[in-house]
């Protein structure tokens, strides 16, 4: 699309503008690695509160109470099970099923690891959560209490206010980028995967004037959608005609 190409020539991609895109943890055996606090009978430091797509389906965080086993130390190395008797007992109890996973076959010594390495500090990092398959962007702010499941993508930033970033990633501009690159599924659903999210272009916050930064922060906290739309249009220097052409109902027609 012509407008998308113009934006690509004018703005950096998300990860060049102070943001990081990632995906939550895949375990290979959710029935064993995921459960309630009481069901995962391991040491407190060997489990993390887990957030899933179901927990944000209403547009806000409504935690379902699940945890995920964390077989990694803070430095990224696998734990020594002998240091955690409850954890060792739990994985030994489920050893047969855990070892059937492909990741266990490739890592005999680390047979109890999750498919993806867990970085526990992500739990306490404020982030935006985005489900994989949606008809439109579903971007939820999580203020730093949960670790994301593998069906959720996350965006963090040290330069952008996350409420502002949420406003931008929920806008028709972000939708246009996803629609331009994602395969379209039945029912006009799109894939909001990391590879497509990374294609989204945004301004660098530090390049905005002080007055525009202030207005942007105010608009992001407004309950008026028209105010948010007008601000995003200004951030991208879009004409009224270009803005109208990005209407999702037109893009999906």
Regions found by a protein language model. Give the residues of each.
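Polybasic, glycine- and aromatic-enriched phosphate-binding surface used to engage nucleic acids
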Residues: 1-214, 234-236
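Amphipathic alpha-helical coiled-coil/heptad-repeat segments
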Residues: 171, 208-253
